[in-house]
Structure formats: C-alpha cells, structure tokens
C-alpha cells in the first residue's frame, strides 16, 4: 500500500514538473497584440514637473511584457497641441493612422484643480488630478472603453509653503493607479 502511494506521488510530481517546464512555451506561442500608449498632458503645468515621465513609468508597467509596445513619441508630439479626449473616434484614428498598433491607449491629463486654505499658522492645499482614458481597437475602428478618473490629495503644514509640484505628482500617481487598473481590466490580450 505504501509503495502504491509512493509511486503515485512520484508520477504526480513528474507530471507537475513537465507541466511547469512547458508553461513558458504556451506564453511564447501567444501572438502579442501591439499597443500604442499615448499620454497627452493638457494640464498646463509645463514640462518641469516630469508629469509625462511619471505617467509613462506607471502605465508602461501595466502593458510591458503582455503587449508589444509601439513607440509613441511622434504621436504624442503630434497630439500635444490640443485636447483629443472629446474628439470623435474617426478623427482621432486618422491622426494615428500611420502607427502599426492593434490597440490605442489614449490617456489625457486634464487641468488640475487646486484649492488652498490658510490662516496665520496653518496652510492646507488640496489638489485634484483629472485623467481621461480611452481604449480603442484600432484594427476594428471601435472604442472599447472611455472614462474620466480623478484623485484628490491633501497636504497640511504649519509653514506657508506646500509645494504645488509635489501635490500635482501625488494626485497624478493616485489617478494613474486607477487608470492602470482600468487598462488591465478592459484591454484585451
């Protein structure tokens, strides 16, 4: 009886090792979809705050490895002048026609909302980051998902200065976390 248990356990381990050894082959066999990630900063805060770098860093973590990422620098420069979040889908797709991607993730940072309150010894700053997200199936010219997200961050101090740029980065990171989760849920493999 003990011998039968031992043999079945060894066979089970052998099957498990064989299965785990071939898992990477299944992943490699899947054709990766190509994704164009476009981040458009329309916040009006300028380049000095590195908001675009932060956005790319956070969002690329969600898609790297699962998708083939298409270089988006040219597309971002082309779309940087105006807001395209409310634009009709055919117009936006015509702007991005030359880029070889199956899906487009269009993320637009809308203007921050800032509220300050202070008295003689206390200073409070509240910053809200608003982000518009569009996920587009470029191959079928269809919008998969569209939503606006926001994140509010507050900071208090007994000094008269709370950095606006640090508050902008904090609120942006909060909103980008939510956007990243939405991308994970709605972007097809």
What kind of feature is each model-predicted range?
Residues 10-21:
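Bacterial N-terminal signal peptides
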Residues 30-34, 39-110, 138-145, 182:
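N-terminal segment of the mature soluble domain
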Residues 47-50, 118-122:
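Short, solvent-exposed loop/turn segments at secondary-structure boundaries
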Residues 56, 128-129:
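Amphipathic alpha-helical segments in well-structured domains
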């Amino acid at each position: 009886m003990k011998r039968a248990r031992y043999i079945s356990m060894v066979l089970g381990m052998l099957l498990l090792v064989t299965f785990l050894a071939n898992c990477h082959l299944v992943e490699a066999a899947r054709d990766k979809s190509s994704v164009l990630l476009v981040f458009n900063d329309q916040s009006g805060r300028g380049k000095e705050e590195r908001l675009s770098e932060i956005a790319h860093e956070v969002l690329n973590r969600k898609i790297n490895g699962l998708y083939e990422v298409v270089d988006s620098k040219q597309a971002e420069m082309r779309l940087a002048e105006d807001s395209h979040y409310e634009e009709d889908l055919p117009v936006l797709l015509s702007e991005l026609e030359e880029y070889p991607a199956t899906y487009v993730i269009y993320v637009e940072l809308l203007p921050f909302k800032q509220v300050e309150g202070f008295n003689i010894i206390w200073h409070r700053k509240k910053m809200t980051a608003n982000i518009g997200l569009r996920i587009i199936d470029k191959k079928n010219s269809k919008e998969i998902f569209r939503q606006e997200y926001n994140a509010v961050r507050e900071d208090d101090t007994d000094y008269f200065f709370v950095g606006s740029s640090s508050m902008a980065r904090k609120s942006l990171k909060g909103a980008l976390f939510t956007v990243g989760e939405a991308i994970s849920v709605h972007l097809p493999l």
